[in-house]
């Protein structure tokens, strides 16, 4: 069965196909960028940033506007949430309304824009002798970040460029683990590195509340938030994947995914893990010392720090999601910026801002303000003092060589929603069927969504 969102997407494709042939991309990589003049262009940039992030972005934009030699003016405009931007982009592409010159987009969203003939292949700009990146520049980007916007299923086009990324990490209470170790309740030191150690500590915590807890909330080892990124993270940690890029098919029912979900189901059945009922409930309970472990985005570090300082005041840090593989496999994600198809001059101007936005020094400043990871390794030099004074951020930063991403395919949003719907049925045992059977059904749904989003 195709979801409501999937049906809406198919309708949008059909509507746009009446205006122009969907997917009939011109060969932007062959464009003669060397002779395009970006002088005097205005770049309208749609983004979702607010608060401190929006303030820092405004500074970056102002610095670029004041210093670039071409007289380019960037206008950064908050257009609401990621979903708001996505909806506005698809409507604009369908109706022929004016597009921005730069837009924040997740990879699965940029795939949709591409199918609607709406994006520039950035490869041609990167390869430009006059405007592109040097080999040294390219080598400075973390490989997993740099390759994340390349789409093999569309001939290797690059539909976005990364200004930042976040990572799924395990948050843990250092002091509580130390208490459990001192009491002989667990058999290892430090954070758990394997699922077996994670279960041992989670079950021990549920039976041995933290002495410094500041709330009456019952102690629990782990609180699971129902989210496709949690699903992917626990699957990656067992050496699996949720998508087969070569076959262009979902693998949500792989042996590793089944093992991951059975593991989490077992934790709940033993009373060692619980659900997250309200947004950020796990973060709050972690702060008060009621929950030993959570798994979530590294960009949440400052919010966890606040929760802890207002709660139990314990020491905490982050580590890799416990894994069965030799090395960690960390789920990395984040929105890139894409360049909509407008005019060559405006497209080049947008690229020149992106190029500035992703320079090492600007990335360091952006990383400090946003708590995202910078996309360049050399930014660590400018962040050295911050990294050394923030052990949790340092621990996460050191995991950057071990990254893997969720599928950059159209129609992923309704699949994510379905994963989040199915997870509690497995976790709590309310669906009594074997996990394999439930995930087979989930995988069929996902592949139907993929087909609907890729054909018309």
Each language-model region and where it sits:
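Extracytoplasmic/periplasmic substrate-recognition and gating elements
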Residues: 94-96, 156, 258, 262, ...
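Short, well-ordered beta-strand elements
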Residues: 39-50, 72-77, 102
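Short, polar/charged alpha-helical segment
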Residues: 31-34, 51-72, 419
